[in-house]
Amino acid sequence: MVAERTRKAAASGSRGPGELGAPGPGTVALAEQCARLPSPGCCGLLALALCSLALSLLAHFRTAELQARVLRLEAERGEQQMEKAILGRVNQLLDEKWKFYSRRRREAPKMSPGCNCPPGPPGPTGRPGLPGDKGAIGMPGRVGIKGQPGEKGAPGDAGMSIVGPRGPPGQPGTRGFPGFPGPIGLDGRPGHPGPKGEMGLVGPRGQPGPQGQKGEKGQCGEYPHREYPGGMLAALRSNPIMSLKLLPLLNSVRLAPPPVIKRRTFQGEQSQTGIQGPPGPPGPPGPSGPLGHPGLPGPIGPPGLPGPPGPKGDPGIQGYHGRKGERGMPGMPGKHGAKGVPGIAVAGMKGEPGTPGTKGEKGAAGSPGLLGQKGEKGDAGNAIGGGRGEPGPPGLPGPPGPKGEAGVDGQAGPPGQQGDKGQPGAAGEQGPSGPKGAKGEPGKGEMVDYNGSINEALQEIRTLALMGPPGLPGQTGPPGPPGTPGQRGEIGLPGPPGHDGDKGPRGKPGDMGPAGPQGPPGKDGPPGMKGEVGPPGSPGEKGETGQAGPQGLDGPTGEKGEPGDEGRPGATGLPGPIGLPGFTGEKGEAGEKGDPGAEVPGPPGPEGPPGPPGLQGFPGPKGEAGLEGSKGEKGSQGEKGDRGPLGLPGASGLDGRPGPPGTPGPIGVPGPAGPKGERGSKGDPGMTGPTGAAGLPGLHGPPGDKGNRGERGKKGSRGPKGDKGDQGAPGLDAPCPLGEDGLPVQGCWNK
């Protein structure tokens, strides 16, 4: 207490003895400075923002440095690699051009000094030479035209899933909540006419009709002792219109047994005037009998006995699994339940801990309120909180929902395994023979053939005799320039047709074609016999959980329970935060003026020790209401108190949510067969199934008949150059060898 007063005195400045001063400027400045300081949360956010900015700048600088290093390295390496690639390509092109344009060097034939023979005739065509070495890789060609898309390949193997292999199919779930009935569907197609029903009972006799007009005079009847059917037939034959009208009646008279016929008069239709018949013979006058009255209708017969039971039908086909029902609509709000019987006071089950609530935003500071008077101590409350009620029994299963829509087509099945490798095919046909090779080089022979011309031979001998001996062979001259390409030769005569080749092996079976168009629907067949009731189908898949229905109406408020026993006092709470200091009290009255002291200024003495605390003064007047203190921080949670006594049962709670659907009950006894239903309308055609896998290759069939002669083949490409010809026969002596033009070789003239 003393320390607090001392601190207040030091903060507010020195005051005179017995006076109350106003708050000093130091207190106000300190309060304003404390209010302006940022909160710890704001400081933390500011520090986090600065750290993020620094990390972003560091990452940016490091990325720029790394990018510059990569560009510099690419510039150094790129020049060397490009230089090597360009030089290698240039050398390759030069080698190709040099090989193409350079002439083959021909070696001079080794001849003795005394050989003066001209070249012999060309030898026979040599054999085709071996294929040359593989040339270098040519320049990449231009991008070709985009080809047509190929045929669709076989489905690939099933890919590996990242999640894992596909598990086995799950068990069918429990039955879902019944959905609301769907909208009214469109009118279906008109059904086929049903079978003809049984003949109904005889109806009651109708009212007598109005009296008809008098009919025309009929024809003269026959004698009564003649047969009735014969006369009737004669009359019908004479009048065809009457025969058409009375033919059903005549048939019923013929087919009916005699005891069943009852004499009854019918009011017939007005007949047409018949054809005048021939005059009959005069008959004896018959007795004119009185006309009888129409008889009364007979009594209604008893109803017929029920027919024997029909034959037992064939057993029905196993039913398909029911389709998954659509998601049900939210349920309607339940009716207001009646008040329940008060339960027994039993300890309720411990509730599950609730989810922690989100921290609320800081509220605005409120205006300072007036200091209220101290309230009286309240009475101890009664523990009347009821325990949690027991869950209600599960509801009855709802009616089955409407039929769901057709499901989406399933995924395509896994591809089939790869088939076995086929047998090797037969050897192919022999290819066409190549064209004739080019003319070979002149042989080393020394014999000249002049095709039997003696004059030319003698002239050549004279020319050779005048020439001198051959000189020494000169040096090999440089290769001449490449000659101009010769003209294209004439098209040769067509060769003889080749022999027919053997028939090739049978080709592999083609892929299965696409499914054909859907055919027109067939006629409806006659209705089959009714079969037995098939076994009950397996339970369908669990439907999707319906949306939760709206909350039901609040039930009536229960009667107020009796007050419970007095609860135990709770644990002492934590002390509250210290409030702000109150306003300074009013200034007291001035004291009496003291006697003037002696004005002898002495030296200031040292500060003396604090004196003993004085007596506690009288309480001052009640100050004004202080400012409302700020809301203190949330205190730590206290220890859990002891369990209170059992309270009275609470009011009846709201109806709980519907329980989970119960397990399906056992299959009931099959009921009696119901009446035969009408024939349903024909269903829509199903979707076209996927194309099946290619079938196995068929067996090797018998060899087919010999085919017709094929068309004449095209001329083949030019074959390779032939080998060098054989050495020719020895010819006449010549001083100088002759060239291709028939003249001596240059440098070997006889001057």
Curated annotation (Swiss-Prot):
It is a single-pass type II membrane protein. The chain crosses the membrane at residues 41-59. Residues 734-751 are annotated as: Nonhelical region 4 (NC4). Keywords: Cell adhesion, Cell membrane, Collagen, Developmental protein, Differentiation, Disulfide bond, Glycoprotein, Heparin-binding, Membrane, Osteogenesis, Postsynaptic cell membrane, Signal-anchor, Synapse, Transmembrane, Transmembrane helix. Residues 204-213, 403-436, 615-628, 684-699 have a biased composition (Low complexity). It comes from the Eukaryota. Residues 468-733 are annotated as: Triple-helical region 3 (COL3). Homotrimer; disulfide-linked. Nucleation of the type XIII collagen triple helix is likely to occur at the N-terminal region with triple helix formation proceeding from the N- to the C-terminus. Interacts with FN1, perlecan/HSPG2 and NID2. Involved in cell-matrix and cell-cell adhesion interactions that are required for normal development. May participate in the linkage between muscle fiber and basement membrane. May play a role in endochondral ossification of bone and branching morphogenesis of lung. Binds heparin. At neuromuscular junctions, may play a role in acetylcholine receptor clustering. This is Collagen alpha-1(XIII) chain. The lineage of its organism: Eukaryota, Metazoa, Chordata, Craniata, Vertebrata. The gene is Col13a1.
